[in-house]
A protein has these predicted regions:
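Terminal low-complexity/charged segments
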Residues: 1-168
Length: 168
């Protein structure tokens, strides 16, 4: 019998108790949230557990939720168990004033580039990263372009009507 979302959630709850929250399954993929201080412990458990075996980091990215005071920035991990062909997603949140998350590069070498990209676009500082610097934008850039701090369109344009896009 293959690995199921119920088994994954049960093992995570058994290990971490109520520290992991917001469990939900969307389109067959289990998602949950973890405190940022636990990101490495959760990743290591998912990787090392003989049943879970989430040994492939599919993606790591950032998100900006400006309305969530104290947890404005999120890091989202997508992991894949190749043996049972099952994927999961989990998020850790941090405040925008001190956006520190522990690096996953010690466990997944692929996290190196993904964390640099996330730093470059969202300003999330990956503590312990071996080479955390901009990777796509110029070094002189003094802002993080994917934060929702900028208008979607040039406000002086008259050829676009925001009402047509549900923003008016």
């Amino acid at each position: 019998m293959g690995l199921t979302n119920e088994t994954i959630q049960s093992k995570l709850t058994e290990k971490f108790g109520d520290q992991l929250t917001a469990f939900e399954t969307t389109y067959g993929m289990l998602s949950f949230e973890a405190p940022k201080e636990l990101n490495l412990k959760v990743l290591n458990f998912l990787y090392d557990d003989d049943t879970l075996q989430f040994r492939f980091l599919t993606d790591l990215t950032g998100l900006h939720y400006p309305a969530q005071t104290g947890r404005e920035l999120a890091v989202v991990y997508h992991l894949h168990n190749m043996t049972d062909n099952i994927r999961i997603r989990f998020k850790v949140f941090t405040g925008i004033n001190q956006p520190d998350i522990y690096t996953a590069t010690g466990l997944f070498s692929a996290a190196n580039w993904m964390e640099r990209e996330t730093y470059d676009f969202f300003g999330i500082n990956f503590v312990g990263h071996p080479n955390l610097k901009r990777i796509l934008n110029v070094d002189e850039m003094d802002y993080f372009p994917l934060r929702k701090e900028f208008p979607l369109e040039d406000q002086t344009r008259i050829d676009k009507d925001d009402e047509m896009f549900g923003r008016g």
